[in-house]
Amino acid sequence: MLKKRACDGAVPCYTGFHPHLLIEKNYYASCLTDEEDNLIQIKEKYSFEKDKTKAKHSPGVYYFKDGATLKKYCQMLVDANETLNGEFYASLPYNYMVNDGKKVWVPTNVDKFCQWGTPEDMADYLFWTECTRRF
C-alpha cells in the first residue's frame, strides 16, 4: 500500500479507545490530517480532538521511504533544536517533511499494540505483568 500511495513517509495511527486515553494528560503524538489521510501536522503530548477517542494517535511506529529522507529530516529537527522537555521526538521530523511538500500518509489501521514508550508505560506493564503472574 505504501508504494501505491507514493508517500515519502507514513505514521500509522489508531483511533478509538485505549486505556491511556482515560487520564487527562496526553502522553503521545497526535496527527492532524486532510480528507485523504495526508498529514498536515503531528504534535507530541497533544490531542487534536477534545474527545481523545476521535483523534489519530501514533503508537510510535514511523516509516521513511529511505535512509536519506530519515537522515535529512531528523538533522533538520536537531539543527532547529526542536525539543520538548529537552528531548527530541521521532515524530517531529514529519512536520519538516510536510513543510517541504513531502507526502506523509496517516493510515488508521493499527488495531492492536502495546505502547511502552514512557516510564509510566513501563510501570503499568510491570504492574500488570506481576498481577497476571499471581494467577
Task: Give the ranges of each region predicted by the language model.
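Catalytic-core segments of class I nucleotidyltransferases/pyrophosphorylases
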Residues: N38-F113, E120-A123, F127-R134
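Conserved beta-loop-beta/alpha segment of the NTase-like Rossmann-fold superfamily
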Residues: M1-S30, E35
